Design a protein with these regions (language model features):
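Catalytic-core regions of glycoside hydrolase
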Residues: 154, 178, 185-188, 192-193, ...
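Short, well-ordered secondary-structure micro-motifs within conserved domains or adaptor modules
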Residues: 22-50
């Protein structure tokens, strides 16, 4: 519950500032004008932006009204910042309306390494404690997520080549799992923890992946390469990927996807087909299994593809779409203009 999270954050700040705090849920009556009271509520106020808030103070009553749960979080953060910046004074605004200007605001964390793993190609890094011990540190993640909230960020991007074979099991392809059973259970527990804690804070965990990459056990089972830029789309590969995405969306709350159609695909026509007939249907399958009608964010990386062509084909079937550029070092260290493949 984002309102409860906001209240707990406010309480912690006021405790540290030396105030005696009593938190009460459900009762919105203001009974004692001598006691400083902060009331946190979600309101259906369409004059506020999405994730926006409205703060009013009359006497000892300060109301923080959020357009949604995230709005309550950001309104509460406004009060927290004012307490911290004024040596603990409770100098709250008589009236303030605010909300984010940018729809997605976030930070990227790479689950990749500077060297290849033995037996694997580029971008192929299963989620394991040996490769990424820090990923399993819950205390560190709580601090990081709280930092994102303090900076009004609403998305966390995890960058990896093919994460699904570390995070979900497929009934039709049980052999595709890329980690041992003990590690898989750790990954399930850790990713569930991360996405649930992020959800409390109004943060989408957006998983990035390259295309088309197959899990190593899956590829070996069918005598395929994990990556082959010149390989056409086949029904088998499409089915495996679609079911992987569906299982991921169904299993973990508050996730989105960042899709790179570059590196291991051949033509723009394949990009369009893959995005509209495999990836988006996979997302929709996962949502349908949950009975959800919302659309989580789906980002298309503009690298090595015709972004406009793909987006134009995708928008009729999926609306919550975004694009992004990753500005690579090799593009920034030359004064010569670079083409689309450098982004």
């Amino acid at each position: 519950n984002r309102v409860l999270f906001s209240a707990e954050q406010l309480q912690s700040t006021l405790d540290k500032a030396g105030y005696q705090v009593m938190m009460q849920q459900g009762d919105t009556t203001f009974s004692d004008p001598e006691i400083k009271t902060i009331l946190l509520t979600e309101v259906n106020d369409t004059t506020l932006k999405k994730e926006g808030f409205h703060i009013t103070t009359t006497g000892n009553l300060t109301r923080v009204s959020g357009r949604d749960g995230s709005g309550v979080i950001y309104g509460s953060r406004e009060l927290i910042d004012r307490v911290n910046d004024s040596d603990g004074k409770l100098d709250f605004p008589e009236e303030l309306k605010d909300g984010p200007e940018m729809v997605l605001r976030g930070a990227c964390v790479g689950l990749q390494k500077m060297t290849y793993l033995p037996g694997h190609g580029v971008y192929e890094y299963p989620y394991t404690p040996e490769s990424f011990p820090w990923f399993y540190d819950k205390e560190q993640w709580i601090k990081y997520l709280d930092m994102l909230v303090a900076n009004r960020m609403n998305s966390l991007y995890l960058w990896n080549g093919h994460p699904f074979a570390s995070l979900v099991k497929l009934e039709d392809y049980p052999f595709a799992l890329e980690v041992d059973e003990e590690t898989f259970k750790k990954n399930e527990e850790m990713f569930s923890f991360l996405t649930e804690e992020a959800d409390k804070r109004g943060i989408f965990v957006i998983q990035m992946f390259y295309n088309i990459i197959l899990s190593k056990p899956f590829a070996e089972h069918y005598g395929l390469k994990t990556q082959d830029r010149n390989r056409p789309i086949t029904p088998l590969i499409a089915d495996y990927t679609r079911k992987s995405i569906a299982a991921f969306i169904e299993k973990y709350p508050n996730v989105g996807l960042l899709v790179c159609l570059g590196e291991a695909m051949c033509t723009v026509e394949d990009d369009v087909e893959w995005f509209t007939k495999t990836i988006i249907p996979g997302v929709k399958d996962g949502l349908q299994a949950l009975g959800r009608t919302d659309e989580p964010p789906l980002l298309l990386r503009a690298h090595d593809t015709d972004c406009k062509l793909v987006m134009d084909a995708a928008l009729p079937i999926y609306k919550n779409l975004y694009t992004m550029h990753k500005y690579n070092g090799e593009s920034l260290t030359t004064y010569e203009p670079r083409g689309p493949l450098s982004l």
